[in-house]
């Protein structure tokens, strides 16, 4: 049995056509189903529906053989028990710092609000900048407006939400897309099966970008 961990939303919607190219079609619509384990058109393949931030955990610990996760999630997770063999080139966005429009660069110790705590600490450590990182789970844009933080680090798509709240994107930390991740033990035990799936998905990604 091959188990693939996916999260609902944009990543799922963009991944399903790629899986379909490999003959893997869910038996019911994951967006509408309440089931968290969904069989597919192949009797030996099933999908797990989990939170986006949990995909690498399920894969690293072997509860899933493969998964699809955003590079932002993988950077924050930082696990060593994963292969990352393929950039699926879907769910593209940018991981950026942002601050109030026109605000001067704060002097001294910086306060940064984000859900990407590990990414923030690494990023500013590389710059030799002292920071206090404040963990938030959502509505990052609010933090600079109410004096909780000087800047935020968040995923930016169009930047419209930032601008609507008086913020502007500033420094690019990473260009983000979704990646296929594979459990290291699964890759050894089911190498032929998984490598065949990787090759098929790679062909589907390339075909999609030729058009």
From Swiss-Prot:
GO CC annotation, single: cytoplasm
A Pfam family this chain is assigned to: HisG
Pathway named in the protein's UniProt entry: Amino-acid biosynthesis; L-histidine biosynthesis; L-histidine from 5-phospho-alpha-D-ribose 1-diphosphate: step 1/9
Main location class: cytoplasm
Enzyme Commission number(s): 2.4.2.17
Cell location: Cytoplasm
Taxonomy, superkingdom: Bacteria
Family the UniProt entry places it in: Belongs to the ATP phosphoribosyltransferase family. Short subfamily.
PANTHER family in UniProt: ATP PHOSPHORIBOSYLTRANSFERASE, ATP PHOSPHORIBOSYLTRANSFERASE ATP-PRTASE
Protein name, as recorded: ATP phosphoribosyltransferase
Organism: Pseudomonas aeruginosa (strain UCBPP-PA14)
Gene name of the encoded protein: hisG
């Amino acid at each position: 049995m091959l188990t693939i961990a996916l999260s609902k939303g944009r990543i799922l919607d963009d991944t399903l056509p790629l899986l379909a190219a490999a003959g893997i079609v869910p038996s019911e619509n994951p967006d509408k189903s309440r089931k968290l384990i969904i069989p597919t058109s192949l009797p030996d393949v099933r999908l797990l529906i989990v939170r986006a931030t949990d995909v690498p955990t399920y894969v690293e610990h072997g509860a899933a053989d493969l998964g699809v996760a955003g590079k932002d999630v993988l950077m924050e997770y930082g696990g060593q028990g994963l292969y990352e063999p393929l950039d699926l080139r879907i769910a593209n966005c940018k991981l950026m710092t942002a601050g109030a429009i026109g605000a001067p660069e704060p002097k001294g110790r910086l306060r940064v609000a984000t859900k990407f705590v590990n990414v923030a600490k690494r990023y500013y450590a590389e710059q030799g900048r002292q920071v206090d990182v404040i963990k938030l789970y959502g509505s990052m844009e609010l933090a600079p407006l109410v004096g909780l933080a000087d800047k935020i680090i968040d995923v930016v798509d169009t930047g419209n939400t930032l601008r609507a709240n008086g913020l502007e994107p500033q420094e690019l930390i990473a260009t983000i897309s979704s990646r296929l991740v594979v459990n290291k033990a699964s890759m050894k035990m089911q190498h032929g099966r998984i490598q065949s799936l990787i090759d098929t998905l790679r062909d589907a990604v390339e075909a999609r970008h030729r058009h």
